[in-house]
Amino acid sequence: MAHTHTNAKLTRETKIIAITILAEARGEGEKGMYAVAAVIAQRAFERKRTPTEVCLKPYQFSCWNGKSLKSLEHLLKVPQADYALALAK
């Protein structure tokens, strides 16, 4: 899959959600990424929080434990990033 996005045009929220999807579903393919996106959406709905708040809540998604957005942005360069970004939007 060709990379069609440019990181400069992505919002902080989109990056955080896509990175969460990519990191938590690593190796699981599109079904796994879809499942992580569904968990984020469901938690946001149930807890009346933004998806970003859900992703960054301590110990909810292990990829963020002790990590920053800058330290994980490299994930947006993997081939699966386009699908994760589409789900994040």
Ranges and model annotations:
Residues A2-K89:
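Bacterial extracytoplasmic/cell-wall-associated proteins, especially those involved in peptidoglycan
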